[in-house]
């Protein structure tokens, strides 16, 4: 244990000298003065001493002259001469002694600057060589280690710090040599030098437990630990088991380990699905740490475009979409002994498809164990779907939560959120606050306004630390939500609904729930997806309230009346684009998708729209069976239109450029970012990728971004300068690498044609020809095949530029208007050339010059003639084969 001594003025020292004295720590158990004192003495002190000596000499000479003048009156001349001689000799002797003293002081001053004073024993022993000093210190360090006593990490750190401030050689029981100075101490705290990681690492390794050991010990304190034996018995007796356990009970991390310890991995792997890729990665990392193995060996994960597993892997975490893709290769899941579908209450699109598929697999594989894990009490529905499966409830670690309601909804709930945060901060006990908001825009708005409100309050209250968390936030900033707030402050976490179940933030005592979330909704009639702000369900409200009762009693402030909410959220399968689902089912040999065993059947018009789109893309034939093109498309873990674009690039000799564009589109809209205080510079940097003789469009601009980044050797600094998110670019590179490998797998020739922009645009159109629009007189656009008015998205490089007459777009989104996102200019005759089965001349007729019309007609005629010749040749071939 060490007691640190603060800075304190030393009596008799000049002011400038006092300001530089520092003291290192000293052991509390002894009454000795500090054994090692470090201080700095300015060089001008020696000059000041010399000046004082000269003044003393002058005063002494004046005094002597006065005395001589008085004595001259009474003494004879001989006596005066003799006395003068004696006085002169005495004066010279004293002066010589003073000079020697001054020189000694000057040398002492030089030695004391930036130096240390050793104890008397060191001076008496003489100079001890460097090796001997370190040997003495090392012996003292190893002495405690040999004693066999277990030392905690904190004690090891304290001992190491004390050793740095303690005398390591010479006699420790002697007072330090400091001539002529008196020190005054008080009880305040001083400072010791900060340890570097390299210095303290070895001590930490010797004295403290590893992170893996701590993680293993923490397993015993989870709520699920007491139910281990009972749980294993139920899994052995029941092929299908529905487990209900609150978030934080340990079901996700512990059940796979219990099964491994019980010997289930001898018959195959244990697979556990997660609805989000971030959850799959973080949980796998935690379990690998608890098991004590390297991530990717015995414990691994698999997410889209990333596989961190090996032949040794026996516990595998994955997204539900990845297990769905494994079913394409291994329909009976023969390599698995247990399948755990975790977070089943979220009812994602892939989860609902998995329910039906694993239900069928369990019927043909009696040895397979199927566990459905949920954090809500919707277990009865799961049990009924799986033929009255057994339900097992694991109690959570919950404290009482006081719920406060608003009688009527607030018109401006963001302002109410800010007022509630300030109210809690000023009136409630210490504890962190968790606020649920719908997305990044709302989080940034509340963060800005809350900071302004706290500045207006000034020093009336303690400080708050605002920690936002959303998907596009850089990882280091996301990690701040898990750091405890400094003493005397309060942390305010602004989060999306990811904090409902996927994240556990300790220290939260208050929850503010406005009662809204964003859900993705697809309109099959228009083919448009919209991210809508909608009220949450009662199940979600219960999850949010539970976040405040994990470490102690909490409060939940609800800005709504819970009676107005629906019991559960609408499953994603009833509000999503089903094209990829139908293509997957067709590739599995399931022809009748309308009578498929869905837990909640999707709308029929959504299934019809998906079948029509797949037929237009060439993935299905006239009777609804998958084609060779469809078999190649299903190999790519992307949207069917995107996969058709990749497959179609082979014809236009630009497959390398197209997979780059596909990878950039797959990372979403998180490539560019616009800081609030640098929006003009960010927009200018983004438009640099569009500059050309003509505006190239968003797809080509994304290609240029990736190629420029590659030329800069994948530089993070370059991304910062261009206002590009390096995290998104690295993910795009990983996606591109996997797409490149899949191209080789399906036998597509790798070609490059970077200078032929028309060829690249045609390849894009090969997959996205249903997404075409033409310019109207009022500046808006009209979809070619649908009577719908759409607009260029403000984030597009074509927004505000000279309008192009014809565009192809990546997707439609509904915000304030129906916007086309990621647009590129095209020529109308390409529609007839690429998709004559989908477009007719009347679809693209307008007031164009006759030459353009003639080119379109010629392209259409030549395409029809080619198709006729192809059909005729096929008929002739069939006749010859029959003969």
Swiss-Prot record:
Residues 845-883 are annotated as: Disordered. Keywords: ATP-binding, Helicase, Hydrolase, mRNA processing, mRNA splicing, Nucleotide-binding, Spliceosome. This is Probable pre-mRNA-splicing factor ATP-dependent RNA helicase DEAH8. PROSITE patterns: DEAH_ATP_HELICASE, HELICASE_ATP_BIND_1, HELICASE_CTER. One of its GO terms (cellular component) is spliceosomal complex. The keyword NAD does not apply. GO terms for molecular function: ATP binding; ATP hydrolysis activity; helicase activity; RNA binding; RNA helicase activity. Predominantly expressed in flowers. Residues 416-589 form the Helicase C-terminal domain. May be involved in pre-mRNA splicing. It catalyses: ATP + H2O = ADP + phosphate + H(+).
């Amino acid at each position: 244990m060490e007691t640190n001594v603060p800075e304190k003025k030393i009596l008799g020292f000049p002011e400038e000298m006092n300001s530089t004295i520092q003291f290192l720590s000293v052991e509390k158990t002894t009454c000795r003065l500090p054994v090692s004192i470090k201080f700095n003495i300015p060089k001008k002190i020696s000059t000041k001493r010399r000046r004082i000596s000269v003044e003393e000499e002058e005063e002494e000479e004046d005094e002597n002259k006065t005395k001589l003048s008085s004595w001259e009156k009474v003494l004879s001349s001989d006596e005066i001469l003799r006395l003068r001689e004696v006085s002169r000799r005495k004066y010279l002797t004293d002066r010589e002694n003073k000079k020697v003293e001054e020189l000694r002081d000057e040398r002492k001053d030089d030695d004391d600057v930036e130096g240390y004073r050793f104890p008397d024993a060191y001076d008496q022993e003489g100079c001890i060589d460097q090796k001997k000093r370190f040997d003495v210190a090392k012996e003292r360090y190893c002495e405690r280690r040999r004693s066999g006593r277990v030392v905690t990490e904190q004690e090891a750190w304290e001992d190491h710090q004390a050793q740095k401030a303690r005398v390591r050689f010479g006699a420790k029981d002697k007072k330090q040599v400091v001539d002529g100075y008196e020190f005054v101490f008080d009880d305040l705290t001083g400072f010791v030098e900060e340890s570097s990681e390299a210095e303290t690492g070895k001590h930490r390794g010797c004295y403290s437990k590893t992170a893996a050991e701590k993680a293993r010990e923490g397993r015993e304190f989870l709520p699920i630990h007491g139910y281990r034996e009972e749980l294993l018995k139920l899994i052995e007796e029941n092929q299908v088991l529905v487990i209900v356990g609150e978030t934080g009970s340990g079901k996700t991390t512990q059940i796979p380990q219990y099964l491994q310890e019980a010997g289930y991995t001898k018959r195959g792997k244990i697979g556990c699905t997660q609805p989000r890729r971030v959850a799959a990665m973080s949980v796998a990392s935690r379990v690998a740490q608890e098991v004590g193995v390297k991530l990717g060996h015995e414990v691994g994960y698999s997410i889209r475009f990333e596989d961190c597993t090996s032949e040794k892997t026996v516990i595998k975490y994955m997204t539900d979409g990845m297990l769905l893709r494994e079913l394409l290769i291994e329909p009976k899941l023969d390599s698995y002994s247990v399948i755990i579908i975790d977070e089943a209450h979220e009812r994602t699109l892939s989860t609902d498809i998995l329910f039906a598929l694993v239900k069928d697999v369990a019927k043909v594989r009696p040895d397979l164990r199927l566990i459905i894990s949920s954090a809500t009490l919707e277990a009865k529905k799961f049990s009924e779907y799986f033929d009255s499966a057994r339900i097992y409830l694991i109690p959570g670690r919950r404290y009482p939560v006081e719920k406060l309601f608003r009688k009527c909804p607030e018109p401006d709930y963001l302002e109410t959120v800010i007022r509630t945060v300030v109210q809690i901060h000023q009136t409630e006990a210490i504890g962190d606050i968790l606020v649920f908001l719908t997305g990044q825009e709302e989080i940034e708005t509340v963060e800005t306004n809350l900071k302004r409100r706290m500045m207006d309050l000034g020093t009336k209250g303690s400080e708050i630390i605002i920690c936002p968390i959303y998907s596009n936030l850089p990882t280091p900033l996301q990690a701040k939500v898990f750091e405890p707030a400094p003493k005397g402050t309060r942390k305010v976490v602004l989060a999306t609904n990811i904090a409902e179940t996927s994240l556990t933030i300790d220290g939260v005592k208050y929850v503010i729930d406005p009662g809204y979330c964003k859900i993705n909704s697809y309109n099959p009639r228009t083919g448009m997806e919209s991210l809508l702000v909608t009220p949450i369900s009662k199940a979600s409200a219960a999850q949010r309230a539970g976040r405040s009762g994990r470490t102690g009693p909490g409060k939940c402030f609800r800005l709504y009346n819970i009676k107005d909410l629906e019991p559960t959220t609408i499953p994603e399968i009833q509000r999503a684009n089903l094209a990829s689902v139908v293509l997957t089912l067709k590739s599995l040999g399931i022809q009748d998708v309308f009578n498929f065993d869905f837990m909640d059947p999707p709308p029929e018009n959504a299934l019809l729209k998906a079948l029509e789109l797949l037929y237009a893309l060439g993935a299905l034939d006239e009777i609804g069976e998958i084609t060779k093109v469809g078999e190649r498309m299903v190999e790519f873990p992307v949207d069917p239109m995107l996969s058709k674009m990749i497959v179609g690039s082979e014809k236009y000799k630009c497959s390398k450029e197209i997979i780059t564009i596909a990878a950039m589109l797959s990372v979403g809209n998180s490539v560019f970012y616009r800081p609030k205080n640098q929006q003009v510079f960010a927009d200018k940097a983004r438009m640099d990728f569009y500059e050309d003789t003509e505006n190239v469009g968003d797809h080509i601009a994304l290609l240029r971004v990736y190629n420029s980044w590659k030329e800069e050797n994948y530089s993070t600094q370059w991304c910062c300068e261009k206002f590009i998110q390096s995290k998104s670019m690295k993910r795009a590179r990983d996606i591109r690498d996997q797409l490149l490998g899949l191209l080789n797998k399906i036998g597509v020739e790798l070609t490059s044609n970077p200078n032929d922009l028309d060829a690249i645009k045609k390849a894009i159109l090969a997959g996205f020809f249903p997404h075409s629009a033409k310019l109207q007189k009022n500046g808006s656009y009209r979809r070619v095949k649908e009577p719908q008015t759409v607009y260029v998205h403000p984030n597009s490089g074509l927004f505000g530029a000279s309008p192009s007459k014809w565009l192809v777009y990546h997707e439609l989104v509904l915000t304030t208007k129906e916007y086309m996102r990621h647009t590129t200019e095209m020529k109308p005759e390409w529609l007839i050339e690429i998709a004559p089965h989908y477009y007719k001349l009347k679809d693209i007729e307008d007031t164009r010059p006759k030459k353009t019309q003639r080119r379109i007609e010629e392209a259409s005629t030549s395409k029809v003639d080619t198709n006729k010749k192809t059909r005729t040749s096929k008929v002739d071939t069939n006749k010859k084969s029959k003969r």
